[in-house]
């Protein structure tokens, strides 16, 4: 879900989160 994704993104280093979120 979006909320869960946001949490994962915050946990990541951002650089890895940017592409993950874009996908």
Swiss-Prot record:
Q: Give the free-text PTM comment from the record.
A: Contains 7 disulfide bonds.
Its GO biological process annotations read: lipid catabolic process
Keywords associated with the record: Calcium, Disulfide bond, Hydrolase, Lipid degradation, Lipid metabolism, Metal-binding, Neurotoxin, Presynaptic neurotoxin, Secreted, Toxin
What's a Gene Ontology MF term here? metal ion binding
List the catalytic activities from the record: a 1,2-diacyl-sn-glycero-3-phosphocholine + H2O = a 1-acyl-sn-glycero-3-phosphocholine + a fatty acid + H(+)
Q: Which domain of life is it from?
A: Eukaryota
Q: What is its EC number?
A: 3.1.1.4
Tissue-specificity statement: Expressed by the venom gland.
Where found?
Answer: Secreted
Q: How is the cofactor bound?
A: Binds 1 Ca(2+) ion.
Record's signal peptide: none
A GO CC annotation recorded here is: extracellular region
User: Which cofactors does the annotated protein need, by name?
Assistant: Ca(2+)
Q: What class of enzyme is it?
A: hydrolase
The UniProt family comment states: Belongs to the phospholipase A2 family. Group II subfamily.
State its role: Snake venom phospholipase A2 (PLA2) that shows presynaptic neurotoxicity. PLA2 catalyzes the calcium-dependent hydrolysis of the 2-acyl groups in 3-sn-phosphoglycerides.
The identity of this protein, by name, is Phospholipase A2 crotoxin basic chain 3
């Amino acid at each position: 879900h979006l909320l869960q994704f946001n949490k994962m993104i915050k946990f990541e280093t951002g650089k890895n989160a940017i592409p993950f979120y874009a996908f």
